[in-house]
Amino acid sequence: MAVNVYSTSVTSDNLSRHDMLAWINESLQLNLTKIEQLCSGAAYCQFMDMLFPGSIALKKVKFQAKLEHEYIQNFKILQAGFKRMGVDKIIPVDKLVKGKFQDNFEFVQWFKKFFDANYDGKDYDPVAARQGQETAVAPSLVAPALNKPKKPLTSSSAAPQRPISTQRTAAAPKAGPGVVRKNPGVGNGDDEAAELMQQVNVLKLTVEDLEKERDFYFGKLRNIELICQENEGENDPVLQRIVDILYATDEGFVIPDEGGPQEEQEEY
């Protein structure tokens, strides 16, 4: 039977979006680029098969699922596995299948803790287990470039920014030759431009997801701040500690003057 995990609070142990994708891709040998792609439920089903062999009817899991009713079917298989192994967790299927970042990110944070509590380190071949199937990729815009970010994602579990910088450094050597080739008019320049555009599209999606993640946590902090302000006159020491944490700044940090950023930009 499974070891249940009930903690859902945000802690320092929680992984960032990039680290979470790196863990999933490395563990299951997938090419996921967005947390939202977990909405199909297929990855969770395979993780359950890894943790508890035989708990999931993996042959029935649709790794190429692209429609909501297919996602729901996968989550039904996952629910059956949870029930079989005594996992005391309600899966918010109706929210997850919508493919929203916030809902999927919260659930995968819990699932990572559940995985860590139950994984015994045994060998597992994810590709053979799913008979070579790959998960369907929703954003067709970046489909040709999916193989490129896989290496930086799986090689970095400590630096969320590393996938971005790796792609930039990889593109730099090609930019020079690309400019030189324009003069002779060789067709290779078009291929190189297309490749660079693919990398730009991947970076744009990465920035978009980072902004969503930022707004998600900022919204939580803003709600906490409002609650503290509503109860400001109660002289609650716990409340005061929360306020102190909310407004704390790094040592040596100075709020810039209104003209500060403008002057810096001009010098730049």
Curated annotation (Swiss-Prot):
The modification N6-acetyllysine is found at K220. GO terms for cellular component: cell projection membrane; centrosome; ciliary basal body; cortical microtubule cytoskeleton; cytoplasmic microtubule; cytosol; focal adhesion; Golgi apparatus. Changing K66R: Abolished crotonylation by KAT5. The keyword Transport does not apply. Residues 146-187 are annotated as: Disordered. Belongs to the MAPRE family. Acetylation at Lys-220 by KAT2B/PCAF promotes dynamic kinetochore-microtubule interactions in early mitosis. It holds the Pfam family CH. It comes from the Eukaryota. This is Microtubule-associated protein RP/EB family member 1. The modification N6-crotonyllysine is found at K66. Residues 153-169 have a biased composition (Polar residues). Residues 185-268 are annotated as: Interaction with CDK5RAP2.
